[in-house]
Design a protein with these regions (language model features):
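N-terminal leader/linker segments that initiate helical-solenoid repeat arrays
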Residues: 1-63, 74, 346-350
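Post-signal peptide N-terminal segment of secreted/secretory-pathway proteins
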Residues: 48-101
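Alpha-helical solenoid scaffolds that mediate protein-protein interactions
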Residues: 64, 71, 86, 108-109, ...
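TPR/TPR-like (Sel1-like) alpha-helical repeat modules
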Residues: 176-186, 219-232, 238-270
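Terminal, low-structured helical/coil segments at or just beyond the last alpha-helical repeat
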Residues: 248-350
Length: 350
């Protein structure tokens, strides 16, 4: 969640300069979120999500950006990722110097989540800005993000390898690239990840179903896809437990199928919960067989948050304290002019 969107296929990078293609599978470790900064983040996020359905309401987000900025400056990596996504993709929100702010935020993120920051650097370079770079550096950052354990980078590499393979004639090299692509899809959705790639899990599940006829893998990777927030994982599991995937010979289970249908319907129709939405709690809702089904009230954690009451507004004393600790203006969350503490991390401020 909250990772850069892959660029269009024609803009994607080349693997020509990579010394090796495979990686040693690892994952990124997420530090605990600071509690005080989290109160700012949750307050901003609730209002943010409630402005996303209509572009005409996005301007209402502006007063809440300061909470994201101050939270990010105080080590809240989720606020950092959400804010970078807003700066990159939400043109409906009028934010001056959005590119420089995004770069500064990513420099800060690199101190906590270096693999995620590398993925953002790769995307920034493809869009024409970011760190000083040479041709091919977008691919280098993407590769390093995967080496450092970012599952979305692994998924994007799988897509890149697949794109290269389908352009080749039938033969050994085409098969090699397709096999390697399949491996990276599985890497991206491996159980090692806290936030597996939703799209990567979906592709791995499709391969396990259509090509390998492996029911255990098909269900596992679809569950990982859903854990990563992709409604497509729930759709696949609904079909499997309805008995529609004949290649798998899975015993139909209507209650499991129904729960997956409820989940997929919510995620598909409630697009405003993205990019933050994940379903980390999926095993507490619909564990895979043979585990029995627990009681469930029919709602996801993100759904309870969005539909629940507005989080308490953070006290101005707390906002001012956290802002002062990082040399920020509490009214905007931007660095105060001529503050060396601000320049340490927000290098675009003049």
């Amino acid at each position: 969640a909250c990772t850069p969107n892959p660029p269009a296929k024609e803009e994607r990078m080349s693997t020509d300069k990579w010394e090796k293609m495979d990686i040693v599978l690892t994952t990124e470790t997420y530090p605990p979120l600071p509690e005080e900064a989290d109160t700012l983040y949750r307050y901003a996020l609730w209002h943010d999500i409630n402005t996303r359905r209509k572009p005409s309401t996005r301007h209402k987000l502006l007063p809440y950006l300061r909470y994201y900025r101050i939270a990010a400056a105080n080590g809240h990596w989720q606020a950092n990722k959400t804010l970078q996504h807003i700066l990159m993709y939400n043109e409906d929100v009028d934010i001056p110097d959005r590119r420089d702010e995004g770069v500064a935020l990513n420099e800060l993120l690199a101190q906590q989540l270096p693999a995620t920051a590398d993925l953002w650097w790769s995307t920034y370079i493809l869009f024409g800005y970011g760190p000083k770079h040479d041709k091919g550096d977008a691919a280098a950052y993407l590769r390093r993000a995967a080496d450092r354990g970012n599952p979305e980078a692994m998924y994007m590499i799988a897509e890149l390898l697949s794109d290269q393979a389908v352009r080749l004639p039938e033969g050994e090299e085409r098969r090699r690239l397709l096999d390697l692509s399949d491996k990276f899809y599985r890497y991206s959705a491996d159980k090692i990840h806290r936030f597996p790639s939703g799209k990567g899990g979906e592709q791995a599940s499709i391969t396990a179903t259509v090509i390998q006829h492996n029911a255990e893998d098909a269900m596992f990777y679809a569950q990982q896809s859903l854990r990563g927030g992709a409604y497509q994982g729930a759709v696949r599991l609904q079909l499997i437990f309805e008995g529609e995937e004949k290649e798998l010979s899975v015993k139909p289970d209507q209650e499991r199928a129904h729960r997956y249908e409820v989940i997929s319907d919510y995620l598909f129709t409630t697009f405003e919960v993205y990019p933050e939405a994940t379903v980390e709690e999926i095993d507490d809702i619909v564990p895979l067989p043979p585990a029995p089904l627990p009681e469930w009230d029919g709602k996801l954690n993100i759904q309870r948050f969005v539909e629940g009451e507005e989080p308490p507004k953070p006290a101005e004393e707390l906002v001012e304290k956290l802002a002062a600790a990082k040399g920020l203006d509490p009214a905007t969350g931007l660095p105060l002019p001529k503050k060396e503490t601000a320049r340490r991390w927000w290098n675009w401020w003049d």
